[in-house]
Amino acid sequence: MDWQTLLTRERLGKPVHSNDELGRSAFHKDHDRIIFSGAFRRLGRKTQVHPVSSNDHIHTRLTHSLEVACVGRSLGMRVGEILREELPEWCDPSDLGVIVQSACLAHDIGNPPFGHSGEDAIRNWFQQAAGRGWLDEMSDAERSDFLHFEGNAQGFRVLTQLEYHQFDGGTRLTYATLGTYLKYPWTSRHAEALGYKKHKFGCYQSELPLLEQITHKLGMPQLDDERWARHPLVYLMEAADDICYGLIDLEDGLEMELLEYSEVEALLLGLVGDDLPDTYRQLGPRDSRRRKLAILRGKAIEHLTNAAARAFVDQQQALLAGQLAGDLVEHMHGPAKLCVQRAKAIAREKIFQDKRKTLHEIGAYTTLEILLNAFCGAALEQYGGHTPSFKNRRILDLLGRNAPDPQWPLYRAFLQVIDFIAGMTDSYATEMAREMTGRSSPS
């Protein structure tokens, strides 16, 4: 792979580059299109790790995505400065920052309500549906898309099909930004076989032609049937997510009183060492722990982004060859690598086992089961031109103009249902499921 091809300004669905808006590069337009999309806006009411809370300090998918985007922009610009002489003439270091920033903004845009438990609930429902014979008419590859449902693949569909220009390029982002978004540029056929991260894949069968087009335009080498090497900038987006995920889990753990401040402080001090800002040294006993943590967190992120940028540059040859094993965190050195690994371990041990989170996950299964039974059941009943019952006609009416056509293959019809349900916020999904079961909202 080479930077000249990897950083093309050409857009999906719009082959000719235009300069019709002064003051914004093609990559800035990508950023703005994601920010103004409805799918991005709805992240504000979707679970990150903990249930959407009355405590405004707890992260949602939206605040997490914004923070990841800030770190991603810094990473892209730092790498861009180092690689300045290797960039194409139309691209400067700030463009790399914007490309990575845009991909970071969109990295969770396809996640369903209720976070990772929502993904698992959808997979579980389709496994039961397969046992009932509901997926029998699909190909093995199509069936696999539902059995391994993945927010990354749904996000790729949102960006390339659903937002703005429906089924005509979607948001029409540049190939460079789409490549940087594609964390897993392969289909569900490889979700289990690769062993990289269980269940992970980035493209449904319905978007496979688009994946082929994007990887061809970017010069991403094909490694196997329906599997390609990753775009190098994906590793910066992934590192930004890992950095923020590790730190914000600890912050949320403090807010929910699942961790002691001294434990988090010790972890971050172990990373930054003596490189403490004067503002931190001047803090007194009357300063809040939130203020202390904010200052310490800022310095910690600086150290982690520096370490990730160094790892990227050190591994550039392997990255451009599509041969880097693992992620950038694995190639970081010293305190930075240990800090991220320890932060994730603390989250697993002390935060993810919280009873409130467990109850929320159980509720997610119930809510999504109600919705999937209703909408997929209605789509199945009308399949092949059959007349649905009055109840199922009314259920399909809720989908409006996005209701599946009776003559569509079941694969396409069920995807349309998933588009609707995965796009819901936690509160909207909960309220709709409650109303479908005849229960009124709590007063």
UniProtKB/Swiss-Prot annotation:
GO biological process, one term: dGTP catabolic process
InterPro entries xrefs: dGTP_triP_hydro_central_sf, dGTP_triphosphohydrolase_C, dGTPase, dGTPase-like, dNTPase_3, HD/PDEase_dom, HD_domain
Residue stretches making up the HD domain: 61-246
Residues that span the membrane, as ranges: none
Keywords (A to Z) from UniProt: Hydrolase
Gene3D superfamilies listed in its UniProt record: eoxyguanosinetriphosphate triphosphohydrolase domain-like, Hypothetical protein af1432, putative deoxyguanosinetriphosphate triphosphohydrolase like domain
Keyword DNA repair: no
Highest taxon in the source lineage: Bacteria
PROSITE patterns attached to this UniProt entry: HD (PS51831)
Single Gene Ontology MF annotation: dGTPase activity
A Pfam family annotated for this UniProt entry: HD
Family matches, as NCBIfam families: dGTP_triPase, PRK01096.1
HAMAP family, A to Z: dGTPase_type3 (MF_01213)
Protein family per UniProt: Belongs to the dGTPase family. Type 3 subfamily.
The protein's name: Deoxyguanosinetriphosphate triphosphohydrolase-like protein
Biological source species: Pseudomonas aeruginosa (strain ATCC 15692 / DSM 22644 / CIP 104116 / JCM 14847 / LMG 12228 / 1C / PRS 101 / PAO1)
